[in-house]
Amino acid sequence: MFQNNPLLAQLKQQIEASKEYVEGVVKTSDKSYGFLECEKNSYFIPPAEMKKVMHGDKVKAVVKRDGDKEQVEIDSLLEPMLERFIAQVRFNKDGKLQLAVDHPSINNFIPANTQKKVTEPLENGDWVVAQLKTHPLRDDRFFFAQVTQFICKADDNFAPWWVTLARHEQPREPVANEKSYELQDQVEREDLTHLYFTTIDSASTKDMDDALYVEPISENGTQTGWRLVVAIADPTAYIPEQSAIEKAARQRCFTNYLPGFNIPMLPRELSDDLCSLVPNEKRPALVGYIETDLSGNVVGEARFVSAWVQSKARLVYDEVSDYLEKVENHWTPDCAETAQQIDWLHQFTLARIDWRSKNALLFKEQGDYSFELAEDGAVKAIHIDYRRIANQMIEEAMIIANICAAQFLDKYAHTGVFNTHSGFDSKNLEPARKFLLDTLANDENRESLSERYSPERLSTLEGYCEMRRDIEQFPENFLEMRLRRYLTFAEFKATSAPHLGLGISHYATWTSPIRKYGDMVNHRLIKQVLSNQTAKPVEETVLARLQEARKQNRMVERDIADWLYARYLEPMVEQNVEFDGEIQDVSRGGLRVKVIENGASVFVPFSTLHNNKEEMLFSPEEIALYIKGEKAYQIGQAVKVKLKEVRVETRSVVGDVLI
């Protein structure tokens, strides 16, 4: 009777048209209800509806109103929070397999089975990779998952490493070795084994990929400059372009340096032995000859050759720094030739630092945090390491070598893997200009600074460098940290473009081919030019993978560090330990404070800062918190914090600001 009834169809259309649909992301609470966070509003999700969804699901819902109360009824799934995910195994009282998702806001226990290829017997707490197979909104069934990969046992002390690598789909083993390695040389190598090359690395370094030789250039008995000879290990001499090793390196893109150990991009036989520039061993290398005047300015064009080299001495950063800084009871070079190389490289470095301070941009010293681990992976201590003079000596040599390689590739290959950075994001040029003027301008200089910081000028290499030098004199970190928010990301490009972050017009790395795939690509291109071949254009897929891998490696490093910090700090909560810190971020939820002593990130909820929410105002433009109309906390501000709670299972560290 009602079938094909036009009036009924019209009624259905009217009812559907009267519904108010919204789209948003599900957010759970510590109760059975939740919220749908939409672009402009937040809607209550009742407990019955929450059973259909999971935290993070993107859904479409219908708004229901009862007087002035609003809630939503879930309509459909737009995008699930979970597809592939990390979880811990749990067996319920009936012995049924369930999975506890490794996410701080997902408390569901998901029923699961195990893929046949997973042969390890599972126990409570074991770490696994799983795939969500069914979703109530998509499949008209309850949540159900399947274990697809075993990661490690519950009591494995190295779980932070293995779980994080699995989360980001990164390998945990080196590339498999070949039975043998043969040279693939197409050009004859020059014999440079007579030059007194030295390496400077950390004491534990095995993959030594750069060695240096430096000498003064003289005219009529007067020194006029420096000749730097940069020898870089040449793994492409052993790796055919279509080999399995090449393909693996192209996928990995970088050696992954993790707390306690690394996972090399190449087989260890290549990275740590056959290609490593160990002392007194003849090694194939790509060598660049670079000449400067006494002011550190590059003179002429760099020359590149394929060569044989032999490192004469393996030096260590701290020992060389102690020697040059005349630290008490310092190490001393064991021969005059080594001492001479250290002295000359030191003089060359000072000239280059001075040149870069005037013509490019210097790095602001921040210090690097490193974990000292016991054999079982426990954190014994956390150290902050600053770049000392020996580190700067290698840094300056590598920077000038990369500048010269970029110029060479641009001129002769017309392609390459170029490191570029365009400074401020184009959409942030006007906000950056406004912030600079609000912070630095006064009645006397406003007109000149307005022109100096115009969007057009800030987007140029010269204008950006001027601005950076202007703010160097300001001790307040908030200036630097605020400006950082307006920057775009560095990019790999196949054609040369400026790197504003370095203040340099051309930059392409080739000095770490054992550790970076982009450097391997640049090696091949330089060697193609040297052998009079047409250089093959760098594929966009290579650049995209480099960009993606760099991001993945940073996330891996961050996630492992967060886990280790939680382990390290947990025992300190009961000790009421206080730390000096610096506010790194201000968000709607609270402050993010970096502990200066060890680099840990501590979250301070807004609710602990003031007892009246109505008197607090968060300013996203200023990245600041106002209390009773006065700015109380802002990015870059020094504060003292005390640990309040550490949850290792969610890697969260919560603290209080001490007034």
From Swiss-Prot:
A GO molecular-function annotation: RNA binding
Catalytic activity: Exonucleolytic cleavage in the 3'- to 5'-direction to yield nucleoside 5'-phosphates
Domain S1 motif: 576-658
Subcellular location field: Cytoplasm
Keyword Acetylation attached: no
Keywords annotated in UniProt: Cytoplasm, Exonuclease, Hydrolase, Nuclease, RNA-binding
All residue ranges annotated as the RNB domain in the record: 189-532
GO biological process: mRNA catabolic process
Database matches in SMART domains: CSP (SM00357), RNB (SM00955), S1 (SM00316)
Enzyme Commission code: 3.1.13.1
Assigned GO CC terms: cytosol
Record's keyword annotation contains RNA-binding: yes
Record Pfam families: OB_RNB (PF08206), RNB (PF00773), S1 (PF00575)
Family assignment from sequence similarity: Belongs to the RNR ribonuclease family. RNase II subfamily.
Function (record text): Involved in mRNA degradation. Hydrolyzes single-stranded polyribonucleotides processively in the 3' to 5' direction.
HAMAP family: RNase_II
Record's protein name: Exoribonuclease 2
Natural source organism: Glaesserella parasuis serovar 5 (strain SH0165) (Haemophilus parasuis)
